[in-house]
Amino acid sequence: VIGGDICNINEHNFLVALYE
């Protein structure tokens, strides 16, 4: 993907945790 993947992944994991 684009630069700043780690931030995006952390944000994605956080949102996934909310929906799980």
Curated annotation (Swiss-Prot):
It is found in: Secreted. GO terms for biological process: proteolysis. The keyword Repressor does not apply. Its main location: secreted. Expressed by the venom gland. One of its GO terms (molecular function) is toxin activity. Its EC number is 3.4.21.-. GO terms for cellular component: extracellular region. Strongly inhibited by PMSF and moderately inhibited by leupeptin. Not inhibited by EDTA, aprotinin, pepstatin, and bestatin. Keywords: Blood coagulation cascade activating toxin, Disulfide bond, Fibrinogenolytic toxin, Hemostasis impairing toxin, Hydrolase, Protease, Secreted, Serine protease, Toxin. Thrombin-like snake venom serine protease that coagulates human plasma and bovine fibrinogen by hydrolysis of the alpha chains (FGA) (minimum coagulation dose is 60 ug on fibrinogen). Has fibrinogenolytic activities, and degrades preferentially the Aalpha chain (FGA). Shows amidolytic activity toward N-benzoyl-L-Arg-p-nitroanilide, has a higher activity than Cdc SI. In vivo, intravenous injection induces defibrin(ogen)ation and a loss of the righting reflex and opisthotoxins, together with a typical gyroxin-like effect (18-20 minutes). Monomer. Negative results: does not induce myotoxicity or hemorrhage, when injected intramuscularly. Is not lethal when administered either intravenously or intraperitoneally into mice (maximum dose tested is 50 ug). Belongs to the peptidase S1 family. Snake venom subfamily. This is Thrombin-like enzyme Cdc SII.
